[in-house]
Structure formats: structure tokens, C-alpha cells
Curated annotation (Swiss-Prot):
InterPro entries assigned to the protein according to its UniProt record, in alphabetical order: Arginosuc_syn_C (IPR048268), Arginosuc_syn_N (IPR048267), Arginosuc_synth (IPR001518), Arginosuc_synth_CS (IPR018223), Arginosuc_synth_type_1_subfam (IPR023434), AS_cat/multimer_dom_body (IPR024074), Rossmann-like_a/b/a_fold (IPR014729)
Pathway(s) per entry: Amino-acid biosynthesis; L-arginine biosynthesis; L-arginine from L-ornithine and carbamoyl phosphate: step 2/3
Name of protein: Argininosuccinate synthase
Residues involved in L-citrulline binding: Y86, N122, R126, S174, S183, E259, Y271
Organism in which the protein naturally occurs: Bacillus cereus (strain Q1)
Keywords: Amino-acid biosynthesis, Arginine biosynthesis, ATP-binding, Cytoplasm, Ligase, Nucleotide-binding
Subunit description: Homotetramer.
Gene Ontology cellular-component annotations: cytoplasm
Location(s) in or outside the cell: Cytoplasm
Protein's gene: argG
HAMAP family cross-referenced by the UniProt entry: Arg_succ_synth_type1
Length: 401
């Protein structure tokens, strides 16, 4: 019987390594796919490990710039903070991984793709909905969800099948990282009352260890895209990396969040997103300077929906594409410079300027240079309040002073 091909999203960890052997037993030839999303792994080692475990082919693709420009950028422009806190670190990478899985599957003539998600997390939904949107004819296999083994049973299977056991397997934490940040769950973090231990963090310093003097960074934007740091131009992926180091040194971007998962449970996770939180803060301030009132007040409603769609795995949905078109239209004049103070866990905007600034000092000032037409206020108030006045007159309402 001829073997079928499956493309596996491969991380190099125990789950996806065991999945290679498990899929072989199901009569599949496995093609491993590992993406460089800026997590800092030794991906050359991961690529070779997949082959040593049993994959017939192994891909390692650097997608950092694509991730930055096509995924993280939209999240920044939409100020995506799920439940007001989480910048969608993992949720942003899943549609890109799904996209590459489908591309390699079509390229290799595979009939299926596979991922290493469990049956109780959000990522299984994000992967599978995205894959269905991109190629509804591919079979999707979720080995970890199907085998339902305990950790001990999985380790025993690995030993029986000569699958290398990672040296950090005794770590209590489950970590996911990319350019946009780092997420951490499990272990002591499963107790929402317990303070996160310092070894749960990697990208940021504890406040007591941060510098006692602030650091200032000037971020330049062109049409909503961050392009410079302190006058130096960077590709977006490098700008994010550089800002992660700068802001992380000052403890910016630590987030402790009990969130409502898509699958109906609550989970407690710790995030580190120094660049993401700094850029979102700076970008919002530049929008405040350059967007007209009606757009500035309407945009948060669109942002909320975009955030929900991304979190829920609907990146490739028609609604998300339509809302993205609106978002892009709002960014045309979001060009300028924002000065941010990094200090003791805070990214504080202290200045902003733009050639498209709608702030007119001569209209805003209370000095002798004031050019605002105060006489116009009387007529404006009369017309603006007219519906309320008429309603009160008709209904014989009396307003007590």
C-alpha cells in the first residue's frame, strides 16, 4: 500500500517528535515544517532533528519579515489587546503557520497536514479553521488530540521508539515565542493566586533590576508603519527585535492575564511583549494627532472586532479582510515621530509630531495668540442642544439646577 504524505508543523519538542513516529505507524511519510518566527531557537538543529526522528524531508523557512509586515503590523495598527491586555502573540503566528503548511502540502503533493495541539487549547481551532479556509480538501490530523496520552505514557512511547527526550522536559512551563512576544503557561502559573516566579520571564527584567534612569526612544512612522528608531531605519522585523531589547531592559510589557479561551475555559498566562506594547502605545498617540474625530471614535469598534476575529482563528475570514481594508484606509496620514520614555515597566509617550497633525496650537491656546472664534460658540450650542431642548419642552420636563 502506497504511503500518503503529511506535512507536520514541527517544533522540535517532544509532542511533534513523537508525532512523527505515530504518523509513521499510520502509514504516512512525514514532511516536517519549522518556521523561524523570531523565537531565537537553533532552527538548524530542529530541522536536522526532524530527519533523525524519521521525517523524509524537513523544511526550515525564515518568515520573520513576512510575520512582521503581514501579521504583527496589522495587530499594531488595530491596537489588538484581547480583553484589554493580551497582544495576541500566539494567535498572530497560527494563520501564518497554517498558510505555510498548506503551501508546502500543495508543493509536495501531500494529502494531509498535521499539528501538535491538544484538544483543550485555542490553537487547534486557529490552525484548522485557517487550513480549511486556504484548502478545504486537505485532511487535518491532530496526533496529540487523538492519542490522549498522559505525559508519562508519551515519554514511555518516545523511549520505546528512540525519540530523543528534550533536556528541558522537566520544566513546568509551556512556552511559545515569536517576534511579537512570549507566552508562558502551566506549572505554578495555573494557580491564579500564585505570583509568577522570576524564571517564568526571559525577555524582560524585574522592576527592581531595571535601570534607575529612564531611556528615551524616538519612533518614526510612515503611513502607520514603524520605520525608524532614534533616526536609524530598520526592516520591521529588526525594529521589533531592537525595541524588544530596549524596552525589555526597562521591564516594559509584562502581562499577567486570566483570559477566556475560545474553547470555553479560563486560563492564566504570563506574557512578555515589550516591543508590542511600546509600539501600540506610540502608534495610538500618533493617531490621536492625525485622525479626525469621527474616525478616531469609530476605529476602536473595528479594532475590537479585529481582535476577536484574530483570537478566534478567523484570520482568513471575509469579515477580517473587509475590516482590514478599513484599517488600511485610516493609516494613510499616520506619519510622524513619537518620543517614548522607557522607565520602570512603563512606556510613556512624552512627545509626538506629524506633518499631518490636526492639532492647531492657535486654536487650542488660551494665550493672546488665540484665533478661535468664541462668538461662534453661542450658535453652536443652540443648534447642538436643540433636540434635547425640544424634547424637554414637549414632555414638560423640568431640569433642577
Amino acid at each position: 500500500m502506497e504511503k500518503k504524505k503529511v506535512v507536520l508543523a514541527y517544533s522540535g519538542g517532544l509532542d511533534t517528535s513523537v508525532a512523527i513516529k505515530w504518523l509513521q505507524e499510520k502509514n504516512y511519510d512525514i514532511i516536517a515544517l519549522c518556521l523561524d518566527l523570531g523565537e531565537g531557537k537553533d532552527l538548524a538543529f530542529v530541522k536536522e532533528k526532524a530527519l533523525s526522528v524519521g521525517a523524509i524531508k524537513s523544511y526550515m523557512i525564515d518568515v520573520q519579515e513576512e510575520f512582521a509586515n503581514e501579521y504583527a503590523l496589522m495587530a499594531m495598527q488595530a491596537h489588538t489587546l484581547y480583553e484589554g491586555k493580551y497582544p495576541l502573540v500566539s494567535a498572530l503566528s497560527r494563520p501564518l503557520i497554517a498558510k505555510k503548511l498548506v503551501e508546502i502540502a500543495e508543493q509536495e503533493g501531500a494529502t494531509a497536514v498535521a499539528h501538535g495541539c491538544t484538544g483543550k487549547g485555542n490553537d487547534q481551532v486557529r490552525f484548522e479553521v485557517s487550513i480549511q479556509a486556504l484548502n478545504p480538501y486537505l485532511e487535518v490530523i491532530a496526533p496529540v488530540r487523538e492519542w490522549k496520552w498522559s505525559r508519562e505514557e508519551e515519554i514511555a512511547y518516545a523511549k520505546e521508539n528512540d525519540v530523543p527526550i528534550p533536556i528541558n522536559l522537566d520544566s513546568p512551563f509551556s512556552i511559545d515565542q515569536n517576534l511579537w512576544g512570549r507566552s508562558n503557561e502551566c506549572g505554578i502559573l495555573e494557580d491564579p493566586w500564585a505570583a509568577p516566579p522570576e524564571d517564568a520571564y526571559e525577555m524582560t527584567l524585574a522592576l527592581e533590576d531595571t535601570p534607575n534612569k529612564p531611556e528615551f526612544v524616538e519612533i518614526g512612522f510612515e503611513a502607520g508603519v514603524p520605520t525608524t528608531l532614534n533616526g536609524t531605519a530598520y526592516p520591521l522585523s529588526e525594529l521589533i527585535k531592537t525595541l524588544n531589547a530596549l524596552a525589555g531592559k526597562h521591564g516594559v510589557g509584562r502581562i499577567d492575564h486570566v483570559e477566556n479561551r475560545l474553547v470555553g475555559i479560563k486560563s492564566r498566562e504570563v506574557y512578555e511583549c515589550p516591543a508590542a506594547m511600546t509600539l501600540i502605545t506610540a502608534h495610538k498617540e500618533l493617531e490621536d494627532l492625525t485622525l479626525v474625530k469621527e474616525v478616531a471614535h469609530f476605529k476602536p469598534m473595528i479594532e475590537q472586532k479585529i481582535t476577536e476575529l484574530i483570537y478566534n482563528g478567523l484570520w482568513f475570514s471575509p469579515l477580517k479582510q473587509a475590516l482590514h481594508a478599513f484599517l488600511q484606509e485610516t493609516q494613510k496620514n499616520v506619519t510622524g515621530m513619537v518620543r517614548v520614555k522607557l522607565f520602570k515597566g512603563h512606556a510613556i509617550v512624552e512627545g509626538r509630531k506629524s506633518e499631518y497633525s490636526l492639532y492647531d496650537e492657535k486654536l487650542a491656546t488660551y494665550t493672546a495668540q488665540d484665533e478661535f472664534n468664541h462668538d461662534a460658540a453661542v450658535g453652536f450650542i443652540s443648534l447642538f442642544g436643540l433636540p434635547t431642548k425640544v424634547y424637554s419642552q414637549v414632555n414638560q420636563k423640568k431640569v433642577e439646577a
